[in-house]
């Protein structure tokens, strides 16, 4: 029997993790294998959202970040509009792409439902001017605070989440949604990086997961950090692994919640059901 004590390990109203725009970018099996589920409850990081059983966040409004809002302005100096590369969080590689290329985007301006700043970066990251962002292009565009590239697992996970065409690539609309997703995770990462080191320690991760509504032991949190941390004297987690871990926890929580039809915080599964549930959700 799998169980969450009193249902308290469900992400609660203390905060919602970033997810795709309602309507979703993973309605079916993603490119690369597996099923990424039905999506996460949309939400931001302000006041607590009304919760369902166990404080699980119910679907609400989309996070802030519409065109003309915090993303607006001219071409960004970094992938999150935070000035030129050199800051600690998720900055792009020093301009391997140069100026915005002409190509298949036309001259009609920013497409509908696409953030202007995300559109500028889409044009820069789309190195082959194909009109799509590949796994390789996405990986080349994103780095951690220690200037390491985002790992393949996280990049593939994000491609799978926002690939509407199921071809292993992201179009401009999907990239705009991914842009917002990354912006939210970067903000959350900065919030919990309390010592401003550019990485998340096991203590900081424990605090982050607790405020997201998870009731997980320090031993489990230390296991996550040791599994996904950088090789250093003091184990710590970079932005890419933070995104991967928190997103996967949310996916598995949703899988558990679907089986917990009695809303009791525990379920009984056969071994094959457990393996199937896990394998179908893991990327």
Curated annotation (Swiss-Prot):
Ca(2+) 1 binds at residues 126, 128, 130, 132, 137. Ca(2+) 2 binds at residues 193, 195, 197, 199, 204. This is Peflin. GO terms for molecular function: calcium ion binding; calcium-dependent protein binding; identical protein binding; protein dimerization activity; protein heterodimerization activity; ubiquitin-like ligase-substrate adaptor activity. It holds the Pfam family EF-hand_7. Keywords: Calcium, Cytoplasm, Cytoplasmic vesicle, Endoplasmic reticulum, Membrane, Metal-binding, Repeat, Ubl conjugation. GO terms for biological process: COPII vesicle coating; endoplasmic reticulum to Golgi vesicle-mediated transport; neural crest cell development; neural crest formation; positive regulation of protein monoubiquitination; response to calcium ion. Residues 21-108 are annotated as: 9 X 9 AA approximate tandem repeat of [AP]-P-G-G-P-Y-G-G-P-P. Ubiquitinated by the BCR(KLHL12) E3 ubiquitin ligase complex. It is a peripheral membrane protein. Residues 113-148, 149-179, 180-215, 216-252, 253-282 form the EF-hand domain. One of its GO terms (cellular component) is endoplasmic reticulum. Residues 31-44, 62-84 have a biased composition (Gly residues). Gene3D superfamilies: EF-hand. It is found in: Cytoplasm; Endoplasmic reticulum; Membrane; Cytoplasmic vesicle, COPII-coated vesicle membrane. SMART domains: EFh. The lineage of its organism: Eukaryota, Metazoa, Chordata, Craniata, Vertebrata. Sequence repeats lie at residues 21-29, 31-39, 41-48, 49-58, 59-67, 75-83, 84-91, 92-99, 100-108. Residues 1-44, 56-114 are annotated as: Disordered.
């Amino acid at each position: 029997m799998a169980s969450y004590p009193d249902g308290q390990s469900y992400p609660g109203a203390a905060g919602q993790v970033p997810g795709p725009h309602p309507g979703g970018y993973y309605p079916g099996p993603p490119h690369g294998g597996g099923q990424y589920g039905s999506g996460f409850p949309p939400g931001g990081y302000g006041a607590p959202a009304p919760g369902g059983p166990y404080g699980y966040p119910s679907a609400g409004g989309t996070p802030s970040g519409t065109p003309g809002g915090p993303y607006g302005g001219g071409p960004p100096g970094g992938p999150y509009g935070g000035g030129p590369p050199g800051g600690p969080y998720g900055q792009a590689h020093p301009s391997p792409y140069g100026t915005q290329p002409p190509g298949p985007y036309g001259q009609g301006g920013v497409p509908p439902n696409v953030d202007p700043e995300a559109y500028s970066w889409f044009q820069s990251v789309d190195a082959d001017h194909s009109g799509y962002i590949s796994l390789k292009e996405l990986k080349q565009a994103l780095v951690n605070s220690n200037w390491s590239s985002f790992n393949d697992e996280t990049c593939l996970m994000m491609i799978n989440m926002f690939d509407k065409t199921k071809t292993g690539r992201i179009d401009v609309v999907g990239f705009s949604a991914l842009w917002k997703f990354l912006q939210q995770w970067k903000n959350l990462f900065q919030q919990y990086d309390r010592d401003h080191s550019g990485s998340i320690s096991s203590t900081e991760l424990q605090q982050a997961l607790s405020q997201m509504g998870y009731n997980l032991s320090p031993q489990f949190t230390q296991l996550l950090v040791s599994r996904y941390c950088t090789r250093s004297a003091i184990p710590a987690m970079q932005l890419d692994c933070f995104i991967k871990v928190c997103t996967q926890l949310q996916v598995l929580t949703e899988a558990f919640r679907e089986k917990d039809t009695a809303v009791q915080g525990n379920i009984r599964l056969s071994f094959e059901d457990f393996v199937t549930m896990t394998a179908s959700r893991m990327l």
